[in-house]
Amino acid sequence: MKIKLVIPDSQDHVSLVGRALKGILEENFPESEVLFLIELAVCEAVANCIKHAYADQGLNKVEVELEIGDSEIVIEVKDEGRKPDPCFMDRKEFQQSCNPESIQEGGRGIPIINQVMDHVDCYSFCKKNILVMKKKIPAQKT
C-alpha cells in the first residue's frame, strides 16, 4: 500500500501529517510505542524540511509518501527548497550538557530520526530533496 500526502510548508500542518500517519498505521500495526516513534520521526523530518528547506515561507509544498511493505515501512519526505548540507544527517547523538542554560532549543530532530528509524538516507534528484526513512516491521499475522 502506498499513500501520498501533500501539505503547505507551514508548521501548522506538521501535526496533521502526524495524525494522518498514525491513523493509517494504526489500521495495520497495533504496537503503539513503535507507532509513536515513527510519528515522532516523521513530524521531526517534516518540521525540519519546512524550517530549513523553505525557511518557513509558507509558499511551497512538502510531500510525504508512506509505503507499507511486507517487512518494512518506507517514508519519504520531499521538498523543492534549499539543498541540505551533505553532512547534516551525520548527527547521531543528542547534545549532552549539565548546564541547562547551554542547551540549545533546536537540533534534536536529526538525532531522533536516526535513533528511531532503521535506515535513513537523504539525496537530491530532479530539483527535489528527498529524505528516505525505513523501519522494519514484524510479519503480519493472517
Where are these regions (language model features)?
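Conserved short strand/loop->alpha-helix "switch" segment adjacent to the catalytic nucleotide/phosphoryl-transfer site
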Residues: L21-C43, S102-I103
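A short, flexible helix-to-loop-to-beta junction within the catalytic ATP-binding CA
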Residues: A53-G58
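A conserved short beta-strand within the histidine kinase catalytic ATPase domain
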Residues: N60-E67
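Short beta-strand-loop-beta element adjacent to the nucleotide/active-site pocket used for signaling
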Residues: E67-I75
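Glycine-rich/acidic phosphate-handling loop/turn and adjacent ATP-lid/helix
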Residues: I75-E105
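Glycine-rich nucleotide-binding loop
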Residues: K83, C126-V132, P138
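Glycine-rich phosphate-binding loop
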Residues: E101-M117
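Glycine-rich ATP-binding loops of the HATPase_c
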Residues: D118-S124
